Regions:
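Short, Lys/Arg-enriched N-terminal segments with co-localized hydrophobic residues
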Residues: 26-33
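Glycine-rich phosphate-binding loops of nucleotide-dependent enzymes
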Residues: 35-293
Length: 293
C-alpha cells in the first residue's frame, strides 16, 4: 500500500527527467554545450585584446586594421615575410611605436602604451634580438640592471648587495628550470643561449604577464636552441603569455598554441597549431590565403 503512492510520484518525475537528460546529451553530442564552455573559459582568460589597430608610415599602412586576443599562459606565434608588419605590431604592443587608431586592453582594462615604460609597468616585457646586456657585467648584475639590491654600510652608505643579487638570481633560474653554473662570469664569456637566458631572466624578475620575443632562437645551435625552447615552455607553465616572432616554422610548430599570419600589414588568419599544417601556413604567408581552401 505504501509502495503504490511512492511509485506514482516517481513516474512523473522520471518522465520530466528523461527529456531533459536527452536534450543535454544531444547538445553535448553535437558540441553546443562544450563549445559554449570553451568560449566562456577563453573569454575569462583573455590577457590582451587588440582591436582594429592601425599604424602608418606616411601613406604606407604597416599595420592595417589588425584585431586579435592573447590568452593567459598561451604561446602565440606571429609569422610572415619581411615587411609583413610583425615588428611594427609588437613595437606598438610594447609602447615603442605610436598607433594611429585602434584600442588595446590588458588584463581587462583599456591601456595607452605610449612609451616602453607604460608597457613595463603593466607587466609587458620585450626581448629584442640585441638583448640589451652589458658585456662587462656578470649574470646577477645584468639580471638586476636598473633594479639593483642595495645595502647600507655604516648605516648610511649605499652599496650594491652582490650576495643577495646572486642568491636571488640563482633562485629565479632554478624556478624556471635553468642551469647556469657560471653566474659570476661576465656575460661576454657566455654562449648565445646562455646570454638569451640572462636576458629572459631579467624580464622574469619583474613578474611579467606577457613576454614579446623577436626571433629568440636566431643564430643558436641545436642544443642552445633546445634550452631556450625549454625555458619558454617553463614560462608558459607559470601562466606567462608569450608572443613569439619567428621565421623558423619548425620552432613555431613545436612551441606555439596558435599561429597568426601577417601579410602586407594585414592579419591573414589565426590558426590552432594542432589543427593546421606547415604547408597551409606557408601558403598563407606566400599567397595571403591557404591555396587548399
Amino acid at each position: 500500500n505504501l509502495f503504490i503512492p511512492a511509485y506514482n510520484l516517481f513516474i512523473p518525475a522520471y518522465n520530466l527527467f528523461i527529456p531533459a537528460y536527452n536534450l543535454f546529451i544531444n547538445k553535448f553530442k553535437y558540441g553546443e554545450i562544450l563549445d559554449k564552455s570553451i568560449q566562456l573559459n577563453q573569454e575569462s582568460n583573455v590577457l590582451m585584446r587588440v582591436s582594429r589597430l592601425m599604424i602608418s608610415y606616411g601613406g604606407l599602412k604597416a599595420v592595417d586594421d589588425v584585431s586579435f586576443e592573447i590568452y593567459t599562459g598561451e604561446i602565440f606565434a606571429l609569422v610572415g615575410d619581411n615587411g609583413a608588419g610583425k615588428s611594427t605590431l609588437v613595437k606598438a604592443l610594447s609602447g615603442a611605436m605610436p598607433q594611429d587608431s585602434g584600442s588595446i586592453e590588458f588584463d581587462g582594462k583599456p591601456v595607452k602604451l605610449v612609451t616602453p615604460r607604460d608597457a613595463d609597468e603593466i607587466g609587458i616585457g620585450c626581448l629584442y634580438q640585441g638583448l640589451g646586456l652589458v658585456d662587462a657585467l656578470n649574470v646577477p648584475e645584468n639580471v638586476f640592471l636598473g633594479q639593483e639590491i642595495q645595502k647600507q654600510i655604516l648605516g648610511f652608505i649605499p652599496q650594491l648587495d652582490h650576495v643577495q643579487m646572486r642568491k636571488k638570481t640563482i633562485e629565479l633560474l632554478q624556478q624556471f628550470g635553468v642551469d647556469l653554473p657560471k653566474v659570476n662570469d661576465a656575460v661576454v664569456n657566455l654562449s648565445g643561449g646562455q646570454r638569451q637566458t640572462v636576458a629572459i631572466s631579467r624580464l622574469l624578475l619583474k613578474n611579467v604577464k606577457l613576454v614579446i620575443m623577436d626571433e629568440p632562437m636566431a643564430a643558436l645551435g641545436v642544443d642552445e636552441g633546445s634550452r631556450v625552447l625549454k625555458l619558454i615552455e617553463n614560462m608558459r607553465s607559470k601562466n606567462i603569455s608569450i608572443i613569439v616572432i619567428s621565421h623558423n616554422l619548425e620552432h613555431v610548430f613545436k612551441l606555439a598554441d596558435r599561429i597568426a599570419v601577417m601579410k602586407n600589414g594585414k592579419l591573414v588568419n589565426i590558426v590552432d597549431t594542432s589543427s593546421t599544417s606547415r604547408e597551409s601556413v606557408v601558403n598563407m604567408i606566400t599567397f595571403g590565403q591557404d591555396q587548399k581552401q
